[in-house]
C-alpha cells in the first residue's frame, strides 16, 4: 500500500481546501518544492500534485511550482498531477517535464473521446480521477453533480486503457471523517486496474483498514489534511502498511 502525500497548489503555494472550496484554503507552505522534499524524507514513494487554479480555470496555472517540484525530486520519485488538463499538448508538456502520470478528471467525464485519445497517445501514463458522492460522479471542481454511476464510468474508462483510477469520496475529502471503505472496495472489485483511494483519511486506523482490503485491488491512498495537521504520521503509517504487507504481517 503506497501512501501518497497530496501537494495542492494554489497561487504557487501549498494549500489544503475543505471540500473543494477555493475560498476555504489553508496555506501550509509557500515553498512547494521544500514540501515535496519533506514528504520524501518521511518515506513517500510517490507524490500527488493538484493544480487547483488549473482545475477551476480549465488550463495550467501553477507551472512554476510544478517544475520546481519535479526538479527537486528528479527521476527517483514518480509524480502524478491533475488539474486543468484538457488537451494532448498539455499532457505531452507535463510528461516531458518530469511528471510520471497525468490525471484526467472532469475532461474525461465531459469528453470521453479526449481520454480515449490520451490513453492511445500516452499509454501507461494516464490516470483517471473520479470524484463521487453517494455513488454519483461530480465534475468541475466538485461544483456540479452528474447522473453517472461511478462504477459504470470507471469500467468504461478501464476499457480505454487508463493506468489506474483515483477514487475520491467528496463528502469526506478534507474532513478527516474516515475513508469510505465500502464504496472504494465496491469500485475496486469491479475493475481489473488498480484503485487509489482518496478522501477522509484521518489516522493510522484508516490506513490499517485500507491495508486489510488492499488485495481487492487498492494500490494506494492519497493523504492530505491528516499529514499536514499531524493526525497521521506519514513515516509511521508507511512503515505500518509495509509491515502489514510483509509475509506474516500482523493484522
From Swiss-Prot:
* Any one GO BP annotation for this protein: L-histidine biosynthetic process
For this protein, the record's Pfam families field holds: His_biosynth
Q: Which residues form the active site?
A: 8 (proton acceptor), 131 (proton donor)
**Record carries keyword Hydrolase:** no
Q: Give a yes or no for keyword Electron transport in this entry.
A: no
Q: Name one GO molecular function term.
A: 1-(5-phosphoribosyl)-5-[(5-phosphoribosylamino)methylideneamino]imidazole-4-carboxamide isomerase activity
The pathway it acts in is: Amino-acid biosynthesis; L-histidine biosynthesis; L-histidine from 5-phospho-alpha-D-ribose 1-diphosphate: step 4/9
CDD domains, per database record: HisA
SUPFAM superfamilies annotated for this entry? Ribulose-phoshate binding barrel (SSF51366)
Provide the top EC class: isomerase
Q: What is its EC number?
A: 5.3.1.16
What are the entry keywords? Amino-acid biosynthesis, Cytoplasm, Histidine biosynthesis, Isomerase
The protein's location, in the record's own words, is: Cytoplasm
- Output the InterPro entries linked to this UniProt entry: Aldolase_TIM, His_biosynth, HisA_bact_arch, Isoase_HisA-like, Isoase_HisA-like_bact, RibuloseP-bd_barrel
Can you cite an annotated GO cellular component? cytoplasm
Principal cellular location given in the protein's record: cytoplasm
Q: Which reaction does it catalyse?
A: 1-(5-phospho-beta-D-ribosyl)-5-[(5-phospho-beta-D-ribosylamino)methylideneamino]imidazole-4-carboxamide = 5-[(5-phospho-1-deoxy-D-ribulos-1-ylimino)methylamino]-1-(5-phospho-beta-D-ribosyl)imidazole-4-carboxamide
NCBIfam families (UniProt xref): 1-(5-phosphoribosyl)-5-[(5-phosphoribosylamino)methylideneamino]imidazole-4-carboxamide isomerase, PRK13585.1
The UniProt entry's sequence similarity note says:
Belongs to the HisA/HisF family.
| Protein name (database record) | 1-(5-phosphoribosyl)-5-[(5-phosphoribosylamino)methylideneamino] imidazole-4-carboxamide isomerase
Amino acid at each position: 500500500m503506497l501512501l501518497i502525500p497530496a501537494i495542492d497548489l494554489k497561487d504557487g503555494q501549498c494549500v489544503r481546501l475543505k471540500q473543494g472550496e477555493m475560498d476555504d484554503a489553508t496555506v501550509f507552505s509557500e515553498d512547494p518544492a521544500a514540501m515535496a522534499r519533506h514528504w520524501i524524507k518521511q518515506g513517500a514513494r510517490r507524490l500527488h500534485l493538484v493544480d487547483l487554479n488549473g482545475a477551476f480555470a480549465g488550463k495550467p496555472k501553477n507551472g512554476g511550482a510544478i517544475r520546481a517540484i519535479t526538479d527537486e525530486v528528479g527521476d527517483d520519485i514518480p509524480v502524478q498531477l491533475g488539474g486543468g488538463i484538457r488537451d494532448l499538448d498539455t499532457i505531452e508538456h507535463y510528461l516531458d517535464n518530469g511528471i510520471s502520470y497525468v490525471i484526467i478528471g472532469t475532461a474525461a467525464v465531459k469528453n470521453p473521446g479526449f481520454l480515449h485519445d490520451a490513453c492511445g497517445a500516452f499509454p501507461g501514463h494516464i490516470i483517471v480521477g473520479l470524484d463521487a458522492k453517494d455513488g454519483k460522479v461530480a465534475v468541475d471542481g466538485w461544483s456540479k453533480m452528474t447522473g453517472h454511476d461511478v462504477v459504470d464510468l470507471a469500467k468504461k474508462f478501464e476499457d480505454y486503457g487508463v493506468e489506474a483510477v483515483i477514487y475520491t469520496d467528496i463528502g469526506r475529502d478534507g474532513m478527516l471523517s474516515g475513508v469510505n471503505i465500502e464504496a472504494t472496495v465496491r469500485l475496486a472489485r469491479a475493475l481489473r486496474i488498480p484503485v487509489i483511494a482518496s478522501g477522509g483519511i484521518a489516522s493510522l486506523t484508516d490506513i490499517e483498514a485500507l491495508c486489510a482490503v488492499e488485495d481487492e485491488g487498492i494500490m494506494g491512498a492519497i493523504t492530505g489534511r491528516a499529514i499536514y495537521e499531524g493526525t497521521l504520521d506519514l513515516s509511521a503509517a508507511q512503515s505500518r502498511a509495509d509491515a502489514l504487507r510483509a509475509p506474516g504481517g500482523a493484522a
